[in-house]
C-alpha cells in the first residue's frame, strides 16, 4: 500500500464506530495469526527438507495455493505443501489454529471450544482429534534415576458405538461379574524429574508390562513399584534394580522409595479427564497425550502447550 493510501485509511479510522473498530482489530489479529501459523508450518521443511511421498531430499518451490508454498520433488515428480502427510492436511480456517491451540491448553469441552472458535461442534471435535493425533506418541524416553511405575484403571467406554452388551447408565461402574473386562489398565511411568510415559495395557501381566517398560527405562534406573507380582516379574526379566513397596503391610514410604509422584499424576489425570463426562476408549490415547502435553507445559512454565507444533510433528519427546 502506498503511503498516501495508508494515510487516507488511518484518517478514516477516526470515523469508525466502536463495533467497527472491534471488527478491524479482529481482522488484524486473524491476519497475524494466519501468518504465524504459516511460519510454524513452513519450519517443518526447514528442519527436514524431504518429500513426504518418497522421502527424497531434492525439492524445489512450485508456486503456492491456499496461502501455503507448494513444492515439487525432483525424484518422484509429485507436488506437496508443508502440511501434506500431517494430521492437519486439508483442514480449513488456518487463522484459527492458534486459537485452537489455546482452547486445548485450557482443556475446554467440545461445545465451549466451538463457541470460542465460532465453529460448529463437529468441526471442534474433528480439530481436537486431528491436533492430538501425533501428541499421543510423544512420551518420555530413557527414564532414569528413581522411576516410579503404577497402574490406574479407566472404565471402558463404547461411546458412539454399539457394543454387544447392555449399556451402562451414564457415570456407571464396572459390573462385578465383568470387572476385568470393563476396566482398562493404564500404566504410568514417571521419574523424579517429571518425565512421563503411559501405556494402555491389554492386561496387567508380566508380558504386557515388560513390553511397555523395555524401551523407556534406562538400564541403570531404579524402578519403584507397589510390589505386585507381575511388576516384580517384569523388572526381573528386564534386569532392572527393583525397589518394591509392601502396600498390603501399610508400607507407603521406605526411605527414598515411594510411588507418591506417579499416584499424584493419576489423581490429576482423572480429575482433568472427568470434565469430559466419559471418553470413548478408542480416543483415550489422544487424551492421555493431551494431558502429558499440558503437564510438560506446566513443568516448563509455558503459558500454553505447543499443541500446533505437536500436531505438525515438530515437538521433541520429553
Predicted segments with their positions:
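Residue-level recognition of single "structural anchor" positions
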Residues: 1-318
Amino acid at each position: 500500500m502506498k503511503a498516501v493510501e495508508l494515510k487516507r485509511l488511518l484518517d478514516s479510522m477516526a470515523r469508525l464506530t466502536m463495533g467497527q473498530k472491534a471488527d478491524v482489530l479482529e481482522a488484524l489479529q486473524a491476519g497475524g495469526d494466519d501468518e504465524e501459523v504459516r511460519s510454524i508450518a513452513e519450519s517443518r521443511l526447514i528442519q527436514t527438507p524431504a518429500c513426504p511421498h518418497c522421502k527424497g531430499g531434492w525439492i524445489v518451490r512450485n508456486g503456492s495455493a491456499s496461502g501455503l508454498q507448494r513444492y515439487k520433488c525432483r525424484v518422484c515428480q509429485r507436488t506437496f505443501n508443508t502440511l501434506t502427510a500431517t494430521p492437519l492436511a486439508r483442514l480449513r480456517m488456518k487463522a484459527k489454529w492458534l486459537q485452537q491451540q489455546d482452547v486445548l491448553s485450557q482443556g475446554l469441552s467440545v461445545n465451549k471450544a466451538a463457541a470460542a472458535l465460532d465453529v460448529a461442534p463437529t468441526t471442534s471435535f474433528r480439530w481436537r482429534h486431528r491436533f492430538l493425533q501425533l501428541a499421543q506418541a510423544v512420551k518420555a524416553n530413557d527414564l532414569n534415576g528413581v522411576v516410579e511405575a503404577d497402574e490406574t484403571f479407566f472404565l471402558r467406554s463404547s461411546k458412539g458405538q454399539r457394543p454387544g452388551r447392555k449399556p451402562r447408565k451414564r457415570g456407571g461402574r464396572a459390573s462385578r461379574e465383568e470387572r476385568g473386562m470393563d476396566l482398562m489398565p493404564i500404566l504410568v511411568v514417571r521419574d523424579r524429574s517429571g518425565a512421563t510415559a503411559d501405556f494402555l495395557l491389554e492386561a496387567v501381566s508380566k508380558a504386557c508390562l515388560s513390553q511397555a517398560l523395555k524401551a523407556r527405562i534406562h538400564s541403570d534406573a531404579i524402578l519403584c513399584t507397589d510390589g505386585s507380582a507381575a511388576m516384580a516379574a517384569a523388572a526381573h526379566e528386564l534386569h532392572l534394580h527393583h525397589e518394591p513397596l509392601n502396600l498390603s503391610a501399610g508400607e507407603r514410604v521406605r526411605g527414598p522409595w515411594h510411588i507418591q509422584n506417579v499416584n499424584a499424576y493419576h489423581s490429576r489425570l482423572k480429575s482433568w479427564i472427568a470434565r469430559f463426562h466419559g471418553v470413548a476408549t478408542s480416543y483415550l490415547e489422544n487424551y492421555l497425550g493431551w494431558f502429558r502435553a499440558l503437564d510438560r507445559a506446566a513443568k516448563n512454565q509455558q503459558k500454553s502447550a505447543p499443541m500446533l507444533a505437536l500436531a505438525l510433528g515438530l515437538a521433541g519427546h520429553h
